[in-house]
A protein has these predicted regions:
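Helix-to-loop junction immediately C-terminal to a conserved catalytic motif
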Residues: 52
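Catalytic Walker B motif of ABC-type/P-loop ATPase nucleotide-binding domains
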Residues: 155-159
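Conserved ABC ATPase "signature" region
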Residues: 100, 111-126
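Conserved ABC transporter NBD signature motif
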Residues: 60-71, 75-76
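Conserved ABC ATPase signature
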Residues: 130-134
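Hydrophobic anchor residue at the start of the ABC signature
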Residues: 144
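Conserved catalytic motifs of ABC-family nucleotide-binding domains
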Residues: 151
Length: 170
C-alpha cells in the first residue's frame, strides 16, 4: 500500500459566488517532487493555500501524511514549509535578525540553524542588510530560508522562480 504525503479529495473553494477551485483530487507519494501547472487564474495558488492550511476548502478533504487538516491543522502545518509567491517579510528587519526570530518561533537554535540556512540559501552577502533593501531574488532566498527553518517534510513553493534573474533560478 503506497503512503501518500498529500491527499486532496474532491476539493473545491468558493469566494462568494466565484468557484476558484472545482472538485480537484490528487495524491502525492512521499518523496515525490511535483508541480502544479496551468494558466493564470486556474486555482494553483488557491490549491496550495488550502494544502498549507491558510485557506479552508469549501468542499472536500485534505490529508497531510494521513492527518485530516481540518481536524488537526497545527500538526499538519508542522510538516509543511511554505514559500508564498509574495512573501510577507518584515522589511524593516535585518535579514539575520529576521531569520533568528523565525528560528526562535519554530523552537530551533538560531545560532546553529541560521548560519546553515544562510549558506544553503546563498544569503551570506545580505545577512546584515534590511529586507526592504534586497532585490526580489534575495527576498525570495530569505523566504526560502524561512520555509526551510523547521526541517519540514513537505516544501511548497509558489512561483519560486518568478521575477528572478536567470542565473538565480538554480
Amino acid at each position: 500500500l503506497e503512503e501518500f504525503m498529500i491527499e486532496v479529495s474532491h476539493v473545491s473553494r468558493n469566494f462568494g459566488t466565484f468557484r476558484a477551485v472545482n472538485d480537484v483530487s490528487f495524491s502525492i507519494p512521499k518523496g515525490q517532487i511535483v508541480g502544479l501547472l496551468g494558466p493564470n487564474g486556474a486555482g494553483k495558488t488557491t490549491t496550495m493555500r488550502m494544502i498549507t492550511g491558510f485557506l479552508a476548502p469549501s468542499d472536500g478533504k485534505i490529508f497531510i501524511d494521513g492527518i485530516d487538516i481540518s481536524e488537526n491543522p497545527v500538526k499538519c502545518k508542522e510538516k509543511i514549509g511554505y514559500m508564498p509567491e509574495s512573501a510577507p517579510l518584515y522589511g524593516d528587519m535585518i535579514v539575520e535578525d529576521y531569520l533568528k526570530y523565525i528560528a526562535y518561533l519554530h523552537g530551533e537554535n538560531p545560532d546553529e540553524k541560521v548560519p546553515l540556512l544562510c549558506e544553503e540559501c546563498g544569503l551570506k552577502e545580505v545577512m546584515s542588510k534590511n529586507i526592504s533593501e534586497l532585490s526580489r531574488g534575495n527576498k525570495q532566498r530569505v523566504s526560502l530560508a524561512h520555509a526551510l527553518m523547521h526541517n519540514p517534510e513537505i516544501l511548497i513553493l509558489d512561483e519560486p522562480t518568478s521575477g528572478l534573474d536567470p542565473n538565480q533560478v538554480e
